[in-house]
Amino acid sequence: MKNYYLVDEKRKTPVSTWEKISQALRRSVKLELFVGLFVMMRELLKRNNSATIKYPFEKVKLDNRYRAVHRLMRFIESENERCIGCGLCEKICISNCIRMETSLDENGRKKVGNYSINLGRCIYCGFCAEVCPELAIVHGTEYENAAEQRSYFGYKQDFLTPIDKLKNQVEFEGAGSLRKDANLWVKKTPNYYDAMLESALENQNTQEQGENK
C-alpha cells in the first residue's frame, strides 16, 4: 500500500532566518491570544471577584452530601450508641477496610467492642452509610486527614460523638440519611391517626377555652 502526501504548491518554505522568525510570529501571535489576554485582565481588575480562597485561613463550605471522614452517632435522649452491631457496613464495604468486633451484653444484645476503618484504603463511596438501618454511621465534613503512612486507621473513639458534645449533634442530612419528606412515604399505623385525632381535639378545646375567657 502506497502512502500519498498532499503537497501545497503555493506554500513557500522559509529559507532565511528572518523568514523563519516571521513565520513563527504569524503562527503564535494571533487575534485569539489578545482576546484571552483581554478576558484575563478584565477579570483581574474586577473587585471582590476572587476565584480562590486563602487556605487554611479560609475553607470552602461543603455540601451536606459531601463524603469525608466517618462519624458514629448517638441517641440524644439516652446518650446510647446508635450502632446495633449488625455488621452490614462491614459486609458491604467494597474496599474491605471496615472491621467490627461485637459481643453480647448482660441483656443478650449485641454490643460493639471495637470498630476501626482503614482511612488510607477507604474510597469514601458512602455504601456503609446508605446501608446502615439505624443511621449510626454517616459521613462528616472532616477532609483534612493526610498521613505519613499508607495504613491510617481510625477507631471507634475517634468517630463516636463525645457525650460532652452531644448537645451540638444534629441529624445528618448527607449520604445515608433519610429524606426530609420521608415521613410522607411511610404507611401510617392506626395509633398514628388516634394520636392525630387526640391532638386535634386538644387544640380545639384549647381554642374554645380561650374564646370563653
Swiss-Prot record:
Which GO terms of the molecular function aspect are on file? 4 iron, 4 sulfur cluster binding; iron ion binding; NADH:ubiquinone reductase (non-electrogenic) activity; quinone binding
Task: Report the enzyme's class at the first EC level.
Answer: translocase
Task: Give the catalytic activity.
Answer: a quinone + NADH + 5 H(+)(in) = a quinol + NAD(+) + 4 H(+)(out)
Highest taxon, organism lineage: Bacteria
Domain 4Fe-4S ferredoxin-type residue range list: 74-103, 113-142
> Where does the chain bind [4Fe-4S] cluster 2?
C93, C122, C125, C128
Give the UniProt record's GO annotations in the biological process aspect: aerobic respiration
UniProt-listed Gene3D superfamilies: 3.30.70.3270
Q: How does it sit in the membrane?
A: Peripheral membrane protein
Could you tell me the EC number(s) of this protein? 7.1.1.-
| One GO location term (cellular component) | plasma membrane
Name its co-factor(s): [4Fe-4S] cluster
Cofactor binding, note field: Binds 2 [4Fe-4S] clusters per subunit.
Locations listed in the record: Cell inner membrane
> What keywords is this UniProt entry annotated with?
4Fe-4S, Cell inner membrane, Cell membrane, Iron, Iron-sulfur, Membrane, Metal-binding, NAD, Quinone, Repeat, Translocase, Ubiquinone
Q: What does this protein do?
A: NDH-1 shuttles electrons from NADH, via FMN and iron-sulfur (Fe-S) centers, to quinones in the respiratory chain. The immediate electron acceptor for the enzyme in this species is believed to be ubiquinone. Couples the redox reaction to proton translocation (for every two electrons transferred, four hydrogen ions are translocated across the cytoplasmic membrane), and thus conserves the redox energy in a proton gradient.
Subunit composition and interactions = NDH-1 is composed of 14 different subunits. Subunits NuoA, H, J, K, L, M, N constitute the membrane sector of the complex.
Kindly provide the name given to this protein in its UniProt entry: NADH-quinone oxidoreductase subunit I
What organism is recorded for this protein?
Campylobacter jejuni (strain RM1221)
